[in-house]
């Protein structure tokens, strides 16, 4: 009976040690993921800034991520170029207006 208790205690110790190693690995992966997200957040393009070279790099606004909005610009030479900036699309502006109005009414 004593041998069985020793073996069970040994198994419980091994299982708890291996699970704590797994948890440490998960925490390390989660920490590196959070650090990568923070780095991309720092590198995002703010509202009204040019996003011609990185159309998916706009920052988040209050409720939605800004969208890269492009227009065609004709230079004095008659050359057409595309210029883009990060901004809030009209349907997102409308949603933010409704939410802001709702907050004022319902507190």
UniProtKB/Swiss-Prot annotation:
Disulfide bonds join 44-59, 51-68, 58-86, 70-84. Keywords: Disulfide bond, Knottin, Secreted, Signal, Toxin. It is found in: Secreted. Belongs to the neurotoxin 19 (CSTX) family. 04 (U1-Lctx) subfamily. Residues 21-41 form a propeptide. Residues 1-20 form the signal peptide. The presence of a 'disulfide through disulfide knot' structurally defines this protein as a knottin. Its main location: secreted. InterPro entries: Spider_toxin_CSTX_knottin, Spider_toxin_CSTX_Knottin_CS. It comes from the Eukaryota. Expressed by the venom gland. GO terms for molecular function: toxin activity. One of its GO terms (cellular component) is extracellular region. This is U1-lycotoxin-Ls1b.
């Amino acid at each position: 009976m004593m041998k069985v208790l020793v073996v069970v205690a040994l198994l419980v110790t091994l299982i708890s040690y291996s699970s704590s190693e797994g948890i440490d690995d998960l925490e390390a992966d989660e920490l590196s993921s959070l650090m990568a997200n923070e780095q991309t957040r720092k590198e995002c393009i703010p509202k009204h800034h040019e996003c011609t070279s990185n159309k998916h790099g706009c920052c988040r606004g209050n409720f939605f991520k800004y969208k890269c909005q492009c227009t065609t610009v004709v230079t004095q030479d008659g050359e057409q170029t595309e210029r883009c900036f990060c901004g809030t699309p009209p349907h997102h502006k409308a949603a933010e207006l409704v939410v802001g109005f709702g907050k004022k009414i319902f507190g």
